[in-house]
Amino acid sequence: MDFVLSELCDQVMTARAGHKPLFIVGGGTKGFYGNHRAVTPQDGHCLLDMTPYRGIVSYQPSELVVTARAGTPLAELEAALAEHGQMLAFEPPHFGPGATLGGCVAAGLSGPRRMAAGAVRDFVLGARLLDSQGHILAFGGEVMKNVAGYDVSRLQAGAQGIFGALLEVSLKVVPRPAVVESLRLPATQDEALRWFGQWRGRPLPISASCWTADGAADGGGAVVL
């Protein structure tokens, strides 16, 4: 991976020397999100493809910490965690088989479990970046308690690469539940809103919830958990 990293640094410095815009790309599953526009090298733009820079750098199941490169497919990371009975605390949407860890953190999309578990940024322990000058910067570490100043690593969640291209991310992971169940309860919209308010004040292991209308004139529907 040292060769891939060297190539990425060279691409950044070449784009900087030529005063060319540099666009960071990954699996391409979140092209709809943010200020996106289609670009190609033929347009005079430089594309920094992060997908070759992939793989799990370190994983300590006993410490509930994993560090992986930005181009690592989310499916690959989640499978590695599942082998040890663990998972990501948040629930990042994949939007396709090419979804990567770097894109997950850069977009900051936490999925339906955000309300109960927390956001992406709450579980970022450390990060390595490639800045606009081709320098590699490191922030945070692999522990929850970081007293080294402002936690720049968590600032990367949702930043969409404006501070630099994510190279590696260290995340806190959590034990995987032994059983997951889905429930569907008949309810009107008013009942659903009342229930949601009550449930939020209790320590219930609800990862996601929604209300769907059934189209009936009486305003009926169902709560799905």
PLM regions: where:
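Residue-level "edge-of-site" marker
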Residues: 28, 93-94, 212
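N-terminal glycine-rich flavin-associated loop
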Residues: 1-24, 50-97, 105, 109-142, ...
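Glycine-rich beta-strand-to-loop/alpha-helix junction loops that act as flexible
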Residues: 24-30
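Short secondary-structure capping/turn micro-motifs that flank functional sites
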Residues: 31-32, 97-98, 215
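Short acidic, glycine/serine/threonine-rich loops at helix termini
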Residues: 33-38, 110, 140-142, 168
